[in-house]
Amino acid sequence: MEATRSDDPSLNPIRNRNPNPNPNPNPLSTIISSAQVWPTIDGPLGLTEEASVDYARRFYKFGFALLPWLWFVNCFYFWPVLRHSRAFPQIRNYVVRSAIGFSVFTALLSAWALTFSIGGEQLFGPLYDKLVMYNVADRLGLSGLA
């Protein structure tokens, strides 16, 4: 009589079971996917989703009132919404638009500043003295040197 071997996987169903059914053996992927996503950077201490939509909308609209730094604040505060593309679609709409607006504003401001500082008097000619702001007090007679 032959004894059955206990180390044969076909005979022992408990040993045949895969302890990790996830085909991706990366343990970090399960941690990241199971973590709750919050709309703001301060996590559970932050705003509710309804209040977040209101704040994102306000930051976006006030950014058009010549306060484009609010677009940066909007992108920073709602960074988790930018990172996770499928989370919070109502908030994401305002945050992505704020990111685009801030990028365009930064590009235009940088181009203007570089053109003015590099080009200077050679680029603008006699108009340069009227454009610069360091001699406004002298031009208006406010410095007392006239």
UniProtKB/Swiss-Prot annotation:
InterPro entries xrefs: Gamma_Secretase_Asp_P_PEN2
UniProt GO cellular component terms: Golgi-associated vesicle; membrane
Annotated transmembrane regions: 62-82, 99-119
Region (Disordered): 1-26
GO annotation, biological process: Notch signaling pathway
UniProt subcellular location: Membrane
Parts of the chain on the Lumenal side: 1-61, 120-146
UniProt xrefs under Pfam families: PEN-2
Membrane association type: Multi-pass membrane protein
Segments on the Cytoplasmic side according to the record's topology features: 83-98
UniProt KW keywords: Membrane, Notch signaling pathway, Transmembrane, Transmembrane helix
Low complexity composition bias: residue spans: 9-19
Protein family according to the UniProt entry: Belongs to the PEN-2 family.
Subunit-level organization: Probable component of the gamma-secretase complex, a complex composed of a presenilin homodimer, nicastrin, APH1 and PEN2.
Biological role: Probable subunit of the gamma-secretase complex, an endoprotease complex that catalyzes the intramembrane cleavage of integral membrane proteins such as Notch receptors.
Protein name, UniProt field: Probable gamma-secretase subunit PEN-2
